């Protein structure tokens, strides 16, 4: 075991997979000599050379399109988009080509590639460096979507994503890149895509989150415990496919659920989860599902902390559910 930040865990995952499998290549803006804007790919160019670690032009469409071509010809590319906000010039390639290659080729071709994206707010980056666009991806059939919150999960799920036979959008909470450290195994391991993590057991209320907001979700659960409320905490980790069984079992047990995300509220991913809970567990709910999200505005520069879900907002939502 070694104490790692998320950046270090991601770097270790890439290094191990490149050493293990010569088909794994890395491409993106500044991923080579500079090691990526957040240094996730630091040292890989020096170790594996320019044929496997490739700096690209500033063109997300080219990055995603090139990754698809590489994947179709037998490689396992890991493409980096500097910020999730920048994916939209490459959105057509991702949605129209990458996500649909297996389907439209009748299974003759697959797209075993990963598109890594630093996502979410909390770094005062404004509307071009703070968005959480996961709803766009989970709405696209053919993509798997991962959103990690810990170094341990980051390493295990990135390795699983690289080995997956289908395209994976891998969302990394930039706010947690270096603010969270934990012991991470140095040996090889993977975590299953599609399985949530039970962070805390409880019986009165279920709190569900993923990615950027998990520290606040866990802090809210701790505050509720001081008030005698037993809150169960689920970290979804994977948004597509999300862990239906874990969510339904937890909410059926507690009867109350608060869903937390830093994405805008309208048509958010947690709205889909809330709707599914309401449809399938209506007769077991003691209160309606309650969402705590970002706001339906462009991401602000000056009010970054007010945009993100706070512990206070989560506690207020929990009180509503408990008092219903």
Curated annotation (Swiss-Prot):
Source organism, top-level taxon: Bacteria
Residues the entry annotates as binding substrate: 83-86, 129
Coiled-coil regions listed in the entry: none
Binding locations of thiamine diphosphate: 29, 58-60, 82, 86-89
Positions of the catalytic residues: 129
The keyword Manganese is annotated on this UniProt entry: no
Keyword Oxidoreductase in record: yes
Gene Ontology molecular function: any one: 3-methyl-2-oxobutanoate dehydrogenase (2-methylpropanoyl-transferring) activity
E.C. code: 1.2.4.4
Catalytic reactions of this protein: N(6)-[(R)-lipoyl]-L-lysyl-[protein] + 3-methyl-2-oxobutanoate + H(+) = N(6)-[(R)-S(8)-2-methylpropanoyldihydrolipoyl]-L-lysyl-[protein] + CO2
Keywords on record: Oxidoreductase, Thiamine pyrophosphate
Cofactor(s) this protein cannot do without: thiamine diphosphate
InterPro entries: THDP-binding (IPR029061), Transketo_C/PFOR_II (IPR009014), Transketolase-like_Pyr-bd (IPR005475), Transketolase_C (IPR033248)
Pfam families: Transket_pyr (PF02779), Transketolase_C (PF02780)
Record note on quaternary structure: Heterotetramer of two alpha and two beta chains. Directly associated with ODBA in the E1 complex.
PANTHER family, alphabetized: PYRUVATE DEHYDROGENASE E1 COMPONENT BETA SUBUNIT, PYRUVATE DEHYDROGENASE E1 COMPONENT SUBUNIT BETA
Its job: The branched-chain alpha-keto dehydrogenase complex catalyzes the overall conversion of alpha-keto acids to acyl-CoA and CO(2). It contains multiple copies of three enzymatic components: branched-chain alpha-keto acid decarboxylase (E1), lipoamide acyltransferase (E2) and lipoamide dehydrogenase (E3).
Protein name: 2-oxoisovalerate dehydrogenase subunit beta
Protein species of origin: Thermus thermophilus (strain ATCC 27634 / DSM 579 / HB8)
């Amino acid at each position: 075991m070694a104490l790692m930040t998320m950046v270090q865990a991601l770097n270790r995952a890439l290094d191990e997979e490149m050493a293990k499998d010569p088909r794994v290549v890395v491409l993106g803006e500044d991923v080579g000599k500079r090691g990526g804007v957040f240094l996730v790919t630091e040292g890989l160019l020096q170790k594996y050379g320019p044929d496997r670690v490739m700096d690209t032009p500033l063109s997300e469409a080219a990055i995603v399109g090139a990754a698809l071509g590489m994947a179709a010809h037998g490689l396992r590319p890991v493409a980096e988009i500097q910020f999730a906000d920048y994916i939209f010039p490459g959105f057509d390639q991702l949605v129209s080509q990458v996500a649909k290659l297996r389907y439209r080729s009748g299974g003759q071709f697959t797209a075993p590639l990963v598109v890594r994206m630093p996502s979410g707010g909390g770094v005062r980056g404004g509307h071009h460096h703070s968005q959480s666009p996961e709803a766009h991806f989970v709405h696209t059939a053919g993509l798997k979507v991962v959103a990690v919150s810990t170094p341990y999960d980051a390493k295990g799920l990135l390795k699983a994503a690289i080995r997956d036979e289908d395209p994976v959008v891998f969302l990394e909470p930039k706010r947690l890149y270096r603010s969270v450290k934990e012991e991470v195994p140095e040996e090889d391991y993977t975590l299953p895509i599609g399985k949530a993590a039970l962070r805390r057991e409880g019986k009165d209320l279920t709190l569900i989150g993923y990615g950027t907001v998990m520290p606040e979700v866990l802090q809210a659960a701790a505050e509720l415990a001081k008030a005698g409320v037993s809150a169960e905490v689920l970290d979804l980790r994977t948004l597509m496919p999300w862990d239906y069984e874990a969510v339904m079992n937890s909410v059926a047990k507690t009867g109350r659920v608060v869903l937390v995300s830093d994405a805008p509220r309208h048509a958010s991913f947690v709205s889909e989860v809330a709707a599914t809970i309401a449809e399938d567990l209506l007769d077991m709910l003691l209160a309606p599902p309650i969402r705590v999200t970002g706001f339906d505005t462009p991401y602000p520069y000056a009010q970054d902390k007010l945009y993100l879900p706070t512990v206070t907002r989560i506690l207020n939502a929990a009180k509503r559910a408990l008092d219903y």
